[in-house]
Amino acid sequence: MKISSGAINFSTIPNQVKKLITSIREHTKNGLTSKITSVKNTHTSLNEKFKTGKDSPIEFALPQKIKDFFQPKDKNTLNKTLITVKNIKDTNNAGKKNISAEDVSKMNAAFMRKHIANQTCDYNYRMTGAAPLPGGVSVSANNRPTVSEGRTPPVSPSLSLQATSSPSSPADWAKKLTDAVLRQKAGETLTAADRDFSNADFRNITFSKILPPSFMERDGDIIKGFNFSNSKFTYSDISHLHFDECRFTYSTLSDVVCSNTKFSNSDMNEVFLQYSITTQQQPSFIDTTLKNTLIRHKANLSGVILNEPDNSSPPSVSRGGNFIRLGDIWLQMPLLWTENAADGFLNHEHNNGKSILMTIDSLPDKYSQEKVRAMEDLVKSLRDGRLTEAGIRPVESSLVSVLAHPPYTQSALISEWLGPVQERFFAHQCQTYNDVPLPAPDTYYQQRLLPVLLDSFDRNSAAMTTHSGLFNQVILHCMTGVDCTDGIRQKAAALYEQYLAHPAVSPHIHNGLFGNYDGSPDWTTRAADNFLLLSSQDSDTAMMLSTDTLLTMLNPTPDTAWDNFYLLRAGENVSTAQISPVELFRHDFPVFLAAFNQQATQRRFGELIDIILSTEEHGELNQQFIAATNQKHSTVKLIDDASVSRLATIFAPLLPEGKLSPAHYQHILSAYHLTDATPQKQAETLFCLSTAFARYSSSAIFGTEHDSPPALRGYAEALMQKAWELSPAIFPSSEQFTDWSDRFHGLHGAFTCTSVVADSMQRHARKYFPSVLSSILPLAWA
């Protein structure tokens, strides 16, 4: 191989090759007669000075790993291949100088790699891990820069250096990324060039369509170590992807959908990040820098690495906007504080937990100074924006949920501005939730709003008694909330001690019933009667109940007992037997009224009363029967002769020969939508209706200890008989059925107290078909 000094265009050759040629020319003085046809992966030490040596051929043995790379049919050929460098002669006979054996060996290696590359275009990628970089330079497996080889055999004696063209469209960029990511997923080690996607264009690309589903799964595959600097992701969708150790510097992520996207250990400095409103879940940043990056007001920054800001100007946004600093990050603010802007930027309760308040607060506590500084800038903006009280009202809860907590309470500026906001928030809570249950407190409410309400009651102690419905609910949820801290519970317990010492409350707790029976609460058990609600109308009336009872009455189920409390007047326990729960709740304790009525509407016993006692024919009697269902005991008795005769006249047509008439039976099935139901389902309903009429005939309602209306006893027994015919399996036994039947009629010496029968049947129904019983039996009787 002869090298000529006149056939090389130096303007197109990388510096390494230029240095190599220059060195050869300097040492050969008068030039070489051979030409370089190809140079590949030449070690950088070739730039050292060439030394003179022998002009005899130099042989180079192939490394074993290169031999093993080829198929067996190639090994025999390659084992015989020797690269000979010969006829490198100095045309200056006066000063023959040859290249040293060391440098010739290096050239041998370069030419050998060229020979191998001509047999497999994948050699460079599979063996050395090298990939082209700009200018034809690559990084080899030992991380040293080399000259990129040609992928095809040389076609001319001139030096050939191949350049790699960039993709021309977002689709091409997406294809290139898919290829690189899949190679990485397969376990291949990518070079820096393989992972270089700087200046890429991914606009409008939905990544879930170009990557396998495993990249979108929780704890799935990761896009790791890629360089996306100065790239465009506008209108793309990178949702559910995890980028680790990636670089996004100066990239544009405008209107990008990044729901639940994770950025970890990444460089996102100087990024324009405005994700789309269709982003459902916030992206997360873990050990990621965001210097001078524009962040929307709905981001979670819990894992961001924050630094001191520089003197950079705010970013330029086409739609305009104001900005505040959060460390070295820029947060976008509205141009004007309108009601819509306040709702969009501040109301995280209305925006799935997202707001600028939550964004700032999401930073860890080690950045408390930066958080306070940013919140002060936000408050100044709100103060200068001159929003009206009506404009602030919808976001008061969101504001106090953040600003009424440390570290922001340390700021005099924030506290001064927030004071009136918190007062209005508290007044609204008292007005709204004194007479209705609070929403079931979630983690957010327990940790952010309950402490604010405790603080407000502490500042305004009179509200404890004037709004005891709300106050007791707040204490209840503080003591039972699984997400409440010990500090919250301790403050709640201390505040309740103040409440119990109030003159309107203290007379009711020294009766041997309250708490631990000595006038103080017992918070070690939920069964203790620790809670005392004052009547909203009569200061002399109070209700005492346990934690469990209060919880279930505020959030009832069909099985909730509505009489498991003490009713106190002047501190003394009074009977509720003849008090209608609905009237008691409406007049004195309205906090339970809505829940009670909601449960009452699900009880359908009244439909049978309307069938038997139509309001047109029996209006007064209908009202008496309905009114009796609203209390445990009735003062109205129907055992006088006139009443007995009237009832007999009404029920006789329904009970020919003591059994339900077919027509009346069909009316019942129709009223309770049982026409197509199974016999067992029909039997369960009739059994529960029988239980209710047994209660009607007992001393608790229309009967006495010694007498009861025969028509009601007979009707109750007829309902039970029909249930037995339909499905004997729903009864405890045939003996129990016979016993109940005898008691209804006083046969065979059976004890005829229908209160006992009603209680026994009710217990059985509650055990074996409780949902049917709960849909029929009046609440006051339950």
From Swiss-Prot:
- E.C. no: 2.3.2.26
Please tell me whether the keyword rRNA-binding is annotated for this protein.
no
User: One Pfam family from the UniProt entry?
Assistant: SopA_C
Positions annotated as active site in the UniProt record: C753 (glycyl thioester intermediate)
**Biased composition, Low complexity: where in the chain?**
157-171
Q: Which GO MF terms does the UniProt record name?
A: ubiquitin-protein transferase activity
Q: How is it modified after translation?
A: Ubiquitinated in the presence of host E1 ubiquitin-activating enzyme, E2 ubiquitin-conjugating enzyme and ubiquitin.
Please list where the region (Disordered) is annotated: 137-171
Major location, coarse class?
Answer: secreted
The places in or outside the cell where this protein is found are: Secreted; Host cell
Q: Which NCBIfam families match?
A: PRK15377.1
Family membership: Belongs to the SopA E3 ligase family.
Q: What's this protein's name?
A: E3 ubiquitin-protein ligase SopA
Q: Which organism is it from?
A: Salmonella heidelberg (strain SL476)
